[in-house]
Amino acid sequence: MPPRPRFDRRAPVRELPNINERIKYPQLRVVDSDGKQLGVIDRLKALEIANQRELDLVLVSEKANPPVCRIMDYGKYKFEQEKKAKEARKKSHQTEVKEVKMRYKIDKHDYDVRIGQATKFLKSGDKVKCTVIFRGREIQHSNLAETLLLKMASDLEEQSEVQQKPKREGRNMIMFLSPRKSPLIKKDNE
């Protein structure tokens, strides 16, 4: 008995588009390349019209009764669809959770650096996880860590909103910030 192959070596079956002779419906509602309705025509007549114009007959909506076809240049149509999909992929930004770690006894300059990092992450559209790490007996001072995280939230309130308030998680205290959809406008009390 020969050994079985480890994976399927056959080429994947690609679904071919319903164009020209691959359309099997006898009656079709045909739309011109300009968007003008040509009415319900039998398939052979629609193919003849498309061939005269040196264009393709493309099935647009299979579920309609009768199915809707459009006379167009399929190569150009396919190129436009790929271009739109590429643009959509480029515009969609996967939001990540970036982490900013610190101790509750943090120096002013180090705190400013963490604020700068968090601001950069928020401007790029990512969520920020602010973590205060406790070592040894420091965990007794969790109220100081909570104060620090709330101060950080107030310093970043123009760019972010608190998604999760400060809470203890093991030997850490965490808080989540997410970027604001619209910038916060500060009111001057004078």
From Swiss-Prot:
Cited PROSITE patterns: IF3 (PS00938)
Q: Where in the cell is it found?
A: Cytoplasm
According to its UniProt entry, what is the function of this protein? IF-3 binds to the 30S ribosomal subunit and shifts the equilibrium between 70S ribosomes and their 50S and 30S subunits in favor of the free subunits, thus enhancing the availability of 30S subunits on which protein synthesis initiation begins.
Q: What is this protein called?
A: Translation initiation factor IF-3
For the keyword Acetylation, the answer is: no
GO biological process terms, alphabetically, are:
ribosome disassembly
What species is this protein from?
A: Prochlorococcus marinus (strain MIT 9215)
Record-linked InterPro entries? T_IF-3_C_sf (IPR036788), T_IF-3_N_sf (IPR036787), Translation_initiation_fac3_CS (IPR019813), Translation_initiation_fac_3 (IPR001288), Translation_initiation_fac_3_C (IPR019815), Translation_initiation_fac_3_N (IPR019814)
Q: Which family does it belong to?
A: Belongs to the IF-3 family.
Its cellular-component GO annotations read:
cytosol; membrane
**SUPFAM superfamilies on file:** Translation initiation factor IF3, C-terminal domain, Translation initiation factor IF3, N-terminal domain
Give the multimer and partner information. Monomer.
Alphabetically sorted, this entry's keywords are: Cytoplasm, Initiation factor, Protein biosynthesis
Q: Where is this region: Disordered?
A: 159-190
Alphabetized GO MF terms:
ribosome binding; translation initiation factor activity
Under Pfam families, the record lists: IF3_C, IF3_N
Its organism's taxonomic lineage begins at: Bacteria, Bacillati, Cyanobacteriota, Cyanophyceae, Synechococcales
